[in-house]
Amino acid sequence: AGFPFFTEFEIFDRHCSKIKNTEHKLDYVSICTPNYLHDAHIRYSLRLGADVICEKPLVLNPWNIDQLSKIEKETGHHINTILQLRLHDSIVNLKKKVDASSENKIFDVDLTYITSRGNWYYTSWKGDIHKSGGISTNIGVHFYDMLQWIFGKVTRNVVHVMSHDRCAGYLEFQKA
């Protein structure tokens, strides 16, 4: 029969109210909504008594993470996030090579990602920095996560350019 899918929060809320009074319960809520709604949808889902699977970014403002941690403790439910680049075969293989290298090996990495965004992008929530978090949060987070997962913790971070449609800088990791 599949799982219910909702494009409107109000209908999802109604669905949750209906099943709350049955023997069924929500184990997980998967949140795939615009970035600026994640925080409220995570809070709602935890308070419903469900664990959460949320696409990136969990929140737009780092200070909201502390409150989400408190709600996790209060409810006993957990938040999980998805950063799918870690699952690509080529990325998994690269991580294995880096992990197998000598402990002192420092890699030289140049990552450039260029993609065009049509007018749709700038007229949608994705083009609004207050709703998406900007290009670094909306798109760059995948690359930051991938690089940190492969090469270790960030030891240096310098931003050279930051605008609505581009970001450039220098990142140094434990192994790159």
Predicted features along the sequence, with ranges:
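Beta-loop-alpha module in the N-terminal Rossmann-like domain of NAD(P)-dependent dehydrogenases
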Residues: P4-S69
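Rossmann-fold dehydrogenase core element
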Residues: I65-L85, E103-D110
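Alpha-helical elements of Rossmann-like donor-binding domains used by nucleotide-donor carbohydrate transfer enzymes
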Residues: Y28, A40, Q67, D89, ...
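Short catalytic-loop micro-motif centered on adjacent basic/acidic residues
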Residues: I31, V52-E55, I79-I82, V158-V159
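Active-site beta-strand termini and strand-to-loop segments that position acidic
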Residues: Y170-K175
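Conserved S-adenosyl-L-methionine
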Residues: T155-S163
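Predominantly a Rossmann-like dinucleotide-binding segment in NAD(P)-dependent oxidoreductases
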Residues: L85-R156
